[in-house]
Amino acid sequence: NVGYITQIIGPVLDVAFSPGEMPNIYNSLVVKGQNPAGQDINVTCEVQQLLGNNEVRAVATSATDGLMRGMGAVDTGAPLSVPVGETTLGRISNVLGEPVDNPGPVQSNTTFPIHRSAPAFTQLDTKLSTFETGIKVVDLLAPYRRGGKIGLFGGAGVGKTVPITELINNIAKAHGGVSVSGGVGERTREGNDLYMEMKESKVINEQNISESKVALVYGQMNEPPGARMRVGSTASTMAEYFRDVNKQDVPLFIDNILRFVQAGSEVSALLGRMPSAVGYQPTLGTEMGSLQERITSTKEGSITSIQAVYVPADDLTDPAPATTSAHLDATTVLSRGLAAKGIYPAVDPLDSTSTMSQPWIVGEEHYETAQGVKQTSQRYKELQDIIAILGLDELSEEDRLTVARARKIERFSSQPFLVAEVFTGSPGKYVSLPETIKGFQMILPGELDNLPEQASYLAGNVDEATAKAAALQVEGQRKGWYRIFA
């Protein structure tokens, strides 16, 4: 069926059809033609509303420059479908599943619609198990669930993208299977950095693209809101193929889920809906639920989703992060205070949570160590006001010891990342869970009280911290002798 455009408002089009030929909601419409300069136009839109008088309102997934009233819009009769399967690995696709890198078209015989139902309740798998990330503070305090949903919460500039990139690197190498990464409304530079990092670490194999382990789907900041709103669904669809057809365990990375919400807010206003709290769309909960409920584990395979969540003005009660956190199994909250001290990853040990932090899941030893770290950190937080007003010397001997150990824990929580070697100047470290538990177990009772604080900073494990302390001592002695002779 062919309709014609009656109105264009930014990325939103009104299209009139003949009586009885109206497209369904979510059907894709294709507008083809030429602009006044003679350039070809090919715009795909998605039907969002049926207006009456045989008109529909659709949202464009690409720029509407050059479109004019009266141009024809073809109803494809189905929702947007994208290529899925092994041919997408090693490639960068856009929201339509079209490749945006150089190696040519994606040769796939299988396509899935991007709007799919969540698995039925009877298909879900409720098995509880953790997976190791190699990041000390995460594995100890807020372990991630295999087949769960995890959120990295943080304001602007506290370091969300670097941990996401590190996790892609660690999991793609250690996990060995395939993964899918969705760039939702983020910077083009970050997408390019991730692509280069993947090629460097051989997760994307340019020589033999079929051996690549990751599929990338990008809808970056400069895209229209229709593309940014649906790129998360495209990434989920690609991950669902590996879960349902190949029966694999698939990590799905989304950076950044708030851009999905913001795109929905832009579209909602253009569709004429009354805004809700803080200007967000009234359908925020429904839109978030329809995306998040598809990301789950079934008896056939699993999708483990790790999502970066931008927190506007560092306010975790903002409707967007608050709605997101309701769907998550673990939250890793990044602290601006820790980032200001140069402690990366700036994970807040007290705000970060996980449903897996239970003694019958992670084991008594792990649980007790994590609780000890949290108690020490909480006591340090309580004492900070007293220290700021009266100074450290006014504390009791016991409290001074607690503060010293808490500061050591804080610094030992920092870790050099493989993807951040150029920034830190230290080789990246993957730290196993037994090493992590051993390190914090030694700090808590005071076995490392003789080590200077700076020895724990950017150290992978206890052995490295001890070696750094010895090096610092030698350096200090050398400087001391130099001062005497000078």
Swiss-Prot record:
Coiled coil: none annotated. One of its GO terms (molecular function) is ATP hydrolysis activity. F-type ATPases have 2 components, CF(1) - the catalytic core - and CF(0) - the membrane proton channel. CF(1) has five subunits: alpha(3), beta(3), gamma(1), delta(1), epsilon(1). CF(0) has four main subunits: a(1), b(1), b'(1) and c(9-12). It is an enzyme of class 7 (translocase). SUPFAM superfamilies: C-terminal domain of alpha and beta subunits of F1 ATP synthase, N-terminal domain of alpha and beta subunits of F1 ATP synthase, P-loop containing nucleoside triphosphate hydrolases. Produces ATP from ADP in the presence of a proton gradient across the membrane. The catalytic sites are hosted primarily by the beta subunits. This is ATP synthase subunit beta, chloroplastic. Belongs to the ATPase alpha/beta chains family. InterPro entries: AAA+_ATPase (IPR003593), ATP-synt_VA_C (IPR055190), ATP_synth_F1_bsu (IPR005722), ATPase_a/bsu_AS (IPR020003), ATPase_alpha/beta_chains (IPR050053), ATPase_F1/V1/A1_a/bsu_N (IPR004100), ATPase_F1/V1/A1_a/bsu_N_sf (IPR036121), ATPase_F1/V1/A1_a/bsu_nucl-bd (IPR000194). It comes from Dennstaedtia punctilobula. The gene is atpB. Its EC number is 7.1.2.2.
